[in-house]
C-alpha cells in the first residue's frame, strides 16, 4: 500500500508500513487533521494482515513540534478545548490508537521532538534518533499538565528523577541524554537513520505476527490499568489549566514573540 495525503505519507515494503508525518513547514506539529489521520492510519495498520510492523517518522528537520500552538490559541480564544480533555478530539483518538496498537511500533526521530512528539515515544517499542535530535516536554512552560499518560510512561522508561526533570523543566534534552536515560534505543547519523530503523523493523516483520502480538501484549497488559488512570488524571488537570492565567500568558507570549512572565501571575497560577 502506498497512499499519500497532504499531511501523512503511507508506504509498505516487506510487511513494514512506514508512516511519515508531512507538515515540514509547521515542523510536523499536530493539528486536528494530523491527529485524526495518524490515528486512522494506526487503526488501519492494526487490522491489515499484510502489515507486521509500523515505522513512524517525520518529513523535514523535525519529528514533531507537538500540538499546533496556533490552533490551540484559536480554540482557547473561542472558548473551545484543545483536546486533552475532550473525548472526540483527534488527540484522544491518537492516544487511543497508540494504546490499542498491538503490533511492534518503531519510531525514527529525524530531528526535534516536542510535547506529543516526545510523549508518543512512550508507546513505541523501539526508538531510533539522529545524533542531533532534541527533545522537550514544554508542559510547564505552556501552563498545562502532562498528556498521553506520560506521567506514568516516561518514569517507566527513564526513572523518576529523569522523568521529573523532563516533565517539569520544559528544557531541551539532547539525543545523547535521551539515549542515556532510556528514552531512545539507538542513535544514528542523520543519513543512516531510516536505513537503520527500517532494517530493524524488517527483521521484526519477518517473524510471526501472532508471536509479535503475544510478546507486545505480555509486555503492555500489566500496565494497562495504570496507563488508563494516568490519562484520566492528566486530562482532568489539563482541562483545569487550559485557558487559565498561566496558559493564557504562555500563548500570548508565543503570539507576541516574547518570554512568558509567570512571576507576575496571581498566587497559585
What are these regions (language model features)?
Residues 58-97, 113, 141-143, 226:
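Glycine- (often His-adjacent) and acidic-residue-rich active-site loop
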Amino acid at each position: 500500500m502506498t497512499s499519500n495525503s497532504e499531511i501523512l505519507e503511507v508506504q509498505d515494503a516487506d510487511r513494514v508500513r512506514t508512516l511519515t508525518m508531512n507538515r515540514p513547514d509547521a515542523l510536523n506539529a499536530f493539528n486536528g487533521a494530523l491527529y485524526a489521520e495518524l490515528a486512522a492510519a494506526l487503526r488501519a495498520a492494526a487490522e491489515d494482515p499484510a502489515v507486521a510492523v509500523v515505522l513512524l517518522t517525520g518529513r523535514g528537520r523535525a519529528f514533531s513540534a507537538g500540538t499546533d500552538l496556533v490552533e490551540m490559541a484559536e480554540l482557547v480564544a473561542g472558548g473551545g478545548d484543545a483536546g486533552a480533555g475532550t473525548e472526540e478530539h483527534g488527540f484522544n483518538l491518537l492516544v487511543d490508537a497508540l494504546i490499542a496498537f498491538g503490533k511492534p511500533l518503531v519510531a525514527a526521530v529525524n530531528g526535534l521532538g516536542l510535547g506529543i512528539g516526545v510523549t508518543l515515544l512512550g508507546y513505541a517499542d523501539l526508538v531510533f534518533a539522529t545524533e542531533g535530535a532534541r527533545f522537550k516536554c514544554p508542559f510547564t512552560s505552556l501552563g498545562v499538565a502532562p498528556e498521553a499518560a506520560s506521567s506514568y510512561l516516561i518514569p517507566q522508561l527513564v526513572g523518576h528523577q529523569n522523568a521529573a526533570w523532563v516533565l517539569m523543566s520544559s528544557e531541551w534534552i539532547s539525543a545523547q541524554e535521551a539515549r542515556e536515560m532510556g528514552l531512545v534505543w539507538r542513535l544514528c547519523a542523520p543519513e543512516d537513520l531510516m536505513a537503520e530503523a527500517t532494517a530493524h523493523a524488517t527483521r521484526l516483520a519477518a517473524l510471526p505476527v501472532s508471536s509479535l502480538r503475544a510478546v507486545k501484549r505480555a509486555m503492555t497488559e500489566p500496565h494497562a490499568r495504570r496507563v488508563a488512570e494516568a490519562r484520566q488524571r492528566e486530562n482532568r488537570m489539563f482541562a483545569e489549566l487550559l485557558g487559565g492565567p498561566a496558559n493564557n500568558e504562555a500563548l500570548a507570549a508565543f503570539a507576541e514573540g516574547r518570554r512568558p512572565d509567570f512571576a507576575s501571575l496571581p498566587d497559585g497560577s
